[in-house]
């Protein structure tokens, strides 16, 4: 009986895994390296409307969040998450360990390998533009997310969305420009570049960009201007 209780507790721990980083919980020394991961988590987090007919269970929400975060290829999520995790582990005071829950969930859910924080990585992190599509329905789950430290080979990822909401965060290189958020709603299929995320197995697909492609192209043009 006790073994069953432990097993059920482990399953329950997977549900409601918040993949967002609380801005107030990120030490100032880690702001730059963690900013892309924080923005990605905020973009990807699903907030179902109460009563929405979308099989809106906690488990589905976790799966949608995890696929969005773990398979993102707009920047090196695997490396930045590990760098952020290392920095926060070093800088977060012992009496504020709950601040690590978000980044720990990302590392665990995505199966990313730990690494040592290098302050030199912050310069490249400051120039990162985070592009992501928030998933909203079970029909968009096309990727199997497997936690653990063993990388799984992947080629390319794609996901089809009947009603995809593309949210784009544009950030400057630290020159004082404000972040800009844009969102475009439109159908179509989004194809990503090779994803090297550990623990992620993505089905191969060959497709044409839909309306979301316009937002991405515009984002890069504006991003180049800001930089």
Curated annotation (Swiss-Prot):
Its main location: secreted. Keywords: Cell wall, Glycoprotein, Secreted. It comes from the Eukaryota. Glycans are attached at residues 55, 72. It is found in: Secreted, Cell wall. Residues 143-162 are annotated as: Disordered. One of its GO terms (cellular component) is extracellular region. This is Protein CAP22.
